[in-house]
Amino acid sequence: MSGTLVLVRHGQSDWNLKNLFTGWRDPDLTELGIEEAKAGGKALADYGIKFDIAFTSVLIRAQRTCQLVLDAVGQSSLETIRDQALNERDYGDLSGLNKDDARAKWGEEQVHIWRRSYDVPPPGGESLRDTGARVWPYYLTDILPRVLSGEKVLVAAHGNSLRSLVMVLDKLTKEQILKLNLATGVPMVYKLNADSTVASKEVLGDMSGAH
Ligand SMILES: O=C(O)[C@H](O)COP(=O)(O)O
């Protein structure tokens, strides 16, 4: 067994609350989002983990979540690397639109395909495959080597940038990834084998309400 990789999706953002497609736009956390991030941090504190390094995106909602988790585990000053590679999927022309308005305009089915399919990009934006094509190389070069050297690594990022990672880690098919939604602020704790495959996965919270 080598190190530990913890993935956590940012807490509820202002645009999650307003039901807007967000992508690379940069809203902050809501009060609930702050509480969710703190709760995820408390779950990790109770789990007893101490991190060696943290990674997050260049977007404020993930950075704030990362800091709130680190505060909760008593590691407020831990080195944190911010990289655009971990950003949310770029929602292209949908960014800033209301998700219900988009359903009314393009239909429930089409919007679901844009939101959850593997390889159909929203207009002007990234498919999950496109997102994975930048998340996965960054994971391989910057994150995985640290985990394999035995470090405990926190990654605070986004619903779809993390779905693209989880798809590979959990060996999900294109059909299975369609159904996977990650809850805000719920940490997933992966222990990896020396060959980088997953030895164990624990979810510290409830993923069932995610949509
Ligand atoms: O970018 C967004 O709108 C959200 O962070 C994730 O949206 P989704 O649930 O539609 O993928």
From Swiss-Prot:
Its EC number is 5.4.2.11. Pfam families: His_Phos_1 (PF00300). This is 2,3-bisphosphoglycerate-dependent phosphoglycerate mutase. It catalyses: (2R)-2-phosphoglycerate = (2R)-3-phosphoglycerate. HAMAP family: PGAM_GpmA (MF_01039). It comes from Rhizobium meliloti (strain 1021). Catalyzes the interconversion of 2-phosphoglycerate and 3-phosphoglycerate. One of its GO terms (biological process) is glycolytic process.
